[in-house]
Amino acid sequence: MKSLILDIPQLKKFADDKRHQETLWSDGHARISLICMKPGQEIVTHTHHGSHIWMVMEGRGNFLTGGKAQVIEVGQVVVVPALEDHGIQNLSAENLVIASITAGGD
């Protein structure tokens, strides 16, 4: 496998009806995805066996876990351990872009 540089601003894509999520790279052990959300879109709270690292690249949103919401914004990184409930809402008036690294599990 060769090294790869991902240009996040060039890879952003949005959909009107729901969030746009696209896998940018995967090697069977880990993957990098780009999550693009217009205002009002969300990822419903859920769990799975893999861990996430979410890096907020643009905008701000509400990170949901344990029945609570916490504002996240550009420059912040969210670490979600495997089997922890998590979701995100874009309740702002601007687009939200998150680079997601997932390792282990599904």
Named regions from a protein language model:
Residues D17-K18, S33-T47:
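Conserved short histidine dyad/triad with adjacent acidic residue
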Residues M1-H29, V78:
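A short, N-terminal "cap"/entry segment at the start of jelly-roll beta-barrel domains
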Residues G28-A30, P39-Q41, R60, G104-D106:
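Short, charged/polar surface micro-motifs in flexible loops or helix N-caps
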